[in-house]
């Protein structure tokens, strides 16, 4: 009895000591505030956060949201991150124009795909949607009753990019009504959700298919359909082709750009030294391995952005 009691007390002390050591270790990390495109959530939480805790002694405190919305919050002074990571040049140029940063470095690239739910009644058709002789993917998505999801083009670049992709698809497949039949109006409440909700609804079978970056569905075990380079916004050599389509939002005419991710240290970063070390780390081999693991491509010959 006494031996059992002593063993129990010893185990309790060890457990308490372990918890205390973990708390001390967490307290020893320097906080790093990173605002990043919502589509990067899985990689940032599962790959980057634990890696920089070891490599940079940093505790990444992330804010995931649409890049356009984040850029507007930064410019308004509503948030003050150390580092901002956006997808496509547009949101980063907003921050550059407001003189919140002096330059932005390309760190990765992706492309548009169509993600779909394995629980959907259209899953088997979509799995064959890119094959010769099969029913084309766009015809499947035009089927009445298909539940398609996307994000708000006013706040999230992906929501804008799926409109560009469908417009390019309309030209590529010689189907002038393709975008209207699949998306309906640009702002379609039946299709538009917050970015994390889109993937969650696919997993639950509440949506049949959705827009996505190639980096997203694989991380969640969801199948996806690859699109031709002429329409997927992922090939820098096709930029002139991409720019043949436009979208008008809030009185502004917008053009697509290749899907490159840019990182910038903000001028009023609370931890400027650590932020610059993080930016250097993002361009190194450890980050490259993590990016590749989560299906991000190299930025290739993409150039830095300056004011």
Report residues per predicted region.
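Boundary at the C-terminal end of the N-terminal hydrophobic targeting segment
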Residues: 16, 23-26
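Bacterial N-terminal signal peptides
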Residues: 4-18
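Exported/periplasmic ABC-transporter solute-binding proteins
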Residues: 25-57, 63, 67-77, 88-89, ...
């Amino acid at each position: 009895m006494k031996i059992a009691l002593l063993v129990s007390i010893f185990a309790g002390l060890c457990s308490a000591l372990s918890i205390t050591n973990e708390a001390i270790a967490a307290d020893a990390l320097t906080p790093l505030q990173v605002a990043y495109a919502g589509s990067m959530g899985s990689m940032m939480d599962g790959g980057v956060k634990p890696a920089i805790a070891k490599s940079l002694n940093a505790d990444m405190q992330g804010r995931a949201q649409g890049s356009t919305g984040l850029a507007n919050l930064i410019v308004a002074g509503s948030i003050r991150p150390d580092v901002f990571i956006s997808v496509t040049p547009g949101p980063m140029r907003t921050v550059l124009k407001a003189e919140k940063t002096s330059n932005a470095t390309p760190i990765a690239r992706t492309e548009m795909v169509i993600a779909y739910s394995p629980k959907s009644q259209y899953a088997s058709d979509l799995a064959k949607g890119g094959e010769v002789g099969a029913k084309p993917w766009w015809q499947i998505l035009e089927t009445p009753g298909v539940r398609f999801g996307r994000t708000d083009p006013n706040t999230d670049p992906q929501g804008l990019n799926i409109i560009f992709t469908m417009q390019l698809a309309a030209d590529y497949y010689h189907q002038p009504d393709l975008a209207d039949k699949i998306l309906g109006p640009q702002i379609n409440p039946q299709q538009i959700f917050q970015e994390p909700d889109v993937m969650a609804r696919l997993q639950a079978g509440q949506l049949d298919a959705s827009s996505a970056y190639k980096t997203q569905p694989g991380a969640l075990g969801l199948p996806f359909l690859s699109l031709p380079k002429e329409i997927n916004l992922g090939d820098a050599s096709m930029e002139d082709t991409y720019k043949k389509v436009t979208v008008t939002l809030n009185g502004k005419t917008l053009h697509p750009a290749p899907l490159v991710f840019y990182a910038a240290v903000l001028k009023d970063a609370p931890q400027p030294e650590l932020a610059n070390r993080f930016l250097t780390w993002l361009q190194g081999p450890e980050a490259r391995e993590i990016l590749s693991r989560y299906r991000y491509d190299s930025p290739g010959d993409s150039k830095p952005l300056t004011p």
